[in-house]
């Protein structure tokens, strides 16, 4: 049977960013470098061959300025990767961006969070009959 399945958007985004940033999917490792970006899918919808995902990006850094600067770079890289049609990524748009001041888990770190919508193509796969 031929089907269209959703891509693992967290992995797609991590792969798009890994060349330029230290990027993780949940859970964060106990030991991690700074600055880094955590990628979490928070929702989404499907229509025909296209999926639209809601993704939260969280940048941890030593200062507010660094966290904000890295986040803007992360968003720029994702938009460029979507234009290149990297993997399944097709379009990235920013919903909101906020500096939360400190990371709730590690108060010594600064945190900048963005909510983005990412459009991606579904994958065509064949499921063998059993």
Where are these regions (language model features)?
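A short, hydrophobic beta-strand-centered structural micro-motif
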Residues: 32-41
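Short acidic low-complexity segments
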Residues: 24-31
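Charged, amphipathic alpha-helical segments and their flanking helix caps
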Residues: 1-22, 40-130
